[in-house]
Amino acid sequence: MSLDAVWAPQTANIGDGPAKKASDQTSMQTQVLQTASLRDGPAKRAVWVRRDNAEKEEPVKSAVSKDRPRLEVTKAVVVDLGTGFCKCGFAGLPKPTHKISTTVGKPYMETAKTGDNRKETFVGRELFNPDIHLKLVNPLRHGIIVDWDTVQDIWEYLFRQEMKIAPEEHAVLVSDPPLSPHTNREKYAEMLFETFNTPAMHIAYQSRLSMYSYGRTSGLVVEVGHGVSYVVPIYEGYPLPSITGRLDYAGSDLTNYLMNLMNNCGKHFSEDHLSIVEDIKTKCCFVALDPIEEKKIPPSEHEIHYTLPDGKEIRLGQERFLCSEMFFKPSLIKSMQLGLHTQTVSCLNKCDIALKRDLMGNILLCGGSTMLRGFPNRLQKELSSMCPNDTPQVNVLPERDTAVWTGGSILASLQGFQPLWVHRLEYEEHGPFFLYRRCF
């Protein structure tokens, strides 16, 4: 199957953001945000490196591995579990076919463990059941799984209710965040092989998959999701964990900060209204190219109306762009961590000269929070200001909010990747440590 015939990434211009007028007055108007064509081969060299290593392995002394079944590429399922959403679909497609909230509902009245078969976890559309009062629970904290039982419930719902498939008939590729505990991979294997009885599985780093969606083999992945942000240098397919940057603020912190700003202006939002605030953030907010100049614009030019679910209208003003300043000045949300642009430059400065030059032109933006209007433009401006003697280049894809899943779809569809599946019989014979021979 040729992925070139299915889809190809598009190029965005630096002036597409909401601060276009301001950007036209700067020298930045000559810069463009670039992407690579998938025709260049989606991370071919990185995949071939792993394929060569896999072929050089000592043959496992097992009759099973000699005659392990060949998997149909179209049957592979790709799952990207994020703090905000869980995305899944069949490998080979350009975007996930199913996307549900990772937040689940638990009844306030806990069910007894003595034969009570009442439902304990409500997922996806089940959350809208008006007859049951639910407390909302998220099984992830800053991108790391803290409740595996709930993750199992989410996947059960995805496989059985959303995709309507039998997981025992499909190989599954799972994404794993940077700097996650090694035990994560063993828990994924245990759940997929022992609970869902999948025939084969593979685990890949999220940042590497994001890079594959750009058709690159090297790059600096700047990922801003819902619960955590990362800056990950990758060279020839290999992430560099020693200089990877992690920031514990992301989209959920932006939502809370926006709520505080609106309440300071006389609104009355609480945690029960976070879904409404999320919608306001998505539809009304943007990132200012120059917040100081933006503040000089008459407030009436920023003012827009938003209709609440009950039909009432509220007016929004400067909080539309002030909320996003937390990414560049985390002290606004009482965080002592570096700003996103500062962390990006810090990671670049830790690289040797040749690698830094390569990564400087391959800054790859990913994650749902980067979809805010003006985000790429502002990051480009901040990086150019901090690196006047270099030429940093921010690259964007139109659907970078699903970049991790798309990269997994590409990877699982490559013919050269097929020997890297870990099969259930291999897992049963050699144990969880066999994962590290194929997933690295």
Curated annotation (Swiss-Prot):
Signal peptide segment: none
Gene Ontology CC annotations of this record: acrosomal vesicle; cytoplasm; cytoskeleton; Golgi apparatus; male germ cell nucleus; motile cilium; nucleus; protein-containing complex
Subcellular location: Cytoplasm, Cytoskeleton; Golgi apparatus; Cytoplasm; Nucleus
Name of the featured protein: Actin-like protein 7A
Record keywords: Cytoplasm, Cytoskeleton, Differentiation, Fertilization, Golgi apparatus, Nucleus, Spermatogenesis
Region (Disordered): 1-27
Quaternary data: Interacts (via N-terminus) with TES (via LIM domain 2). Heterodimer with TES; the heterodimer interacts with ENAH to form a heterotrimer. Interacts with ACTL9. Interacts with CYLC1; the interaction may be relevant for proper acrosome attachment to the nuclear envelope.
Function description: Essential for normal spermatogenesis and male fertility. Required for normal sperm head morphology, acroplaxome formation, acrosome attachment, and acrosome granule stability. May anchor and stabilize acrosomal adherence to the acroplaxome at least in part by facilitating the presence of F-actin in the subacrosomal space. May play an important role in formation and fusion of Golgi-derived vesicles during acrosome biogenesis.
Tissues where this protein is expressed: Detected in testis. Detected at the acrosome of round spermatids (at protein level).
PANTHER family: ACTIN
Cytoplasm as UniProt keyword: yes
Start and end residues of each stretch annotated as Required for interaction with TES: 36-56
SUPFAM superfamilies: Actin-like ATPase domain
Membrane-traversing stretches: none
Swiss-Prot/TrEMBL GO biological process terms: acrosome assembly; fertilization; single fertilization; spermatid development
Similarity-based family: Belongs to the actin family.
Organism of provenance: Rattus norvegicus
Database matches in CDD domains: ASKHA_NBD_ACTL7
